[in-house]
Amino acid sequence: MPDRVKEHVFALDARWCDELEEVLFSDPVPNLYSIEHYLSCPLPVRAPRIPLHYYQGFVGCERDGQLCCVLLLGSNVVPVRWCGAAIEYDVAEHVEASDAPTLDATALAHRDALAQLLLQVGSRLDSMFGESAFVMPLWTRLQELCEQSRGGKSPLLQMLQPSLRDGCDHRARVLSERPNQPLLYLPPEKDLARFYAVELPELPAHLPAPLKPGESPAGAFQPSGEPAGYARLATSADLGELLPAAAAMFTEEVGFDPIARYGEGYAARLRTLIAGQRSAIVTDVNGRVIFKADAGIVNLDAAQVQGVWLHPDYRGYGLAKPFFAAAAQILQRHYPHLSLYVNDYNARALAMYRGTGWEQIGQFSTIIFER
């Protein structure tokens, strides 16, 4: 297999700042993760002299001196732009094969080079996610390269296929493949109060009631603004109850225990969210967190909502809509432009989001790997 990585892919350095910023900030809502990384880890003055598959940061390809492909490389890979994506993805979704325009040689070479780079990264990959138009063509080509590498010593092939003797099973180590995840946006002008300023349904006697506004435990500090409905911002005093709730959400959604994998780093992440007034919660009268939603990724006045979770004991009683609307109202006071993405098979969640004013503006895809 020719080494297309050396031929086409390079680490972005400070010379590419203007072009990278144009890519990221021209459409900030789907690019919030990459923007957050860019602002916290600016491009280096000079490109590092290490093999790219060991590099963590932005890499790209150029066409006629212009940046045409961008990929954020790390344990979590985010394809930000690919010069052939519009053609290939639109064709796959909307155009008959006989009428399909063909990708030019440069677009094909760039796609192959980026896929080959991920093949070299191998078992360090935890996930790949981003806009479907960029993720899915790259993921498809990556699987094809795994097939072509059959019998070789590709690290990613060994990750996806524990035993080469069993034949090529390029999904053997894929924990979850989620090709269709609607990207939703909540317009700032939406009236959320009508969803949360309501009487809650009656709950079974064995369930502790949600804590009503104004009945916070003595000494609890509300760092900013008023509660909305039954939701409020989490404080440092809530960490002990928030941690198991967040871990339960993560395990349900992703498929593994974040505390077991990330240890203290996961609790540190929650502390950061609390300190930044980015975690909205509902507790029961005993202080247990029964609902949560976070502004997981933020930039200026925009945030991506993550970690939406309702305790299993409280599901099926019509609480998700008023709790989530209240949490979104609180987060929107700090970040008027809220977005999130959700699995298309989660019909109940999709209905709840759309029923509280969220509108689809795009589509994400996520591939999660086992370690």
Predicted regions located by residue number:
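Acetyl-CoA-dependent GNAT
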Residues: 73-78, 254-255, 264-306
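Conserved acetyl-CoA-binding loop of GNAT-fold acetyltransferases
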Residues: 143-149, 166, 328, 354-363
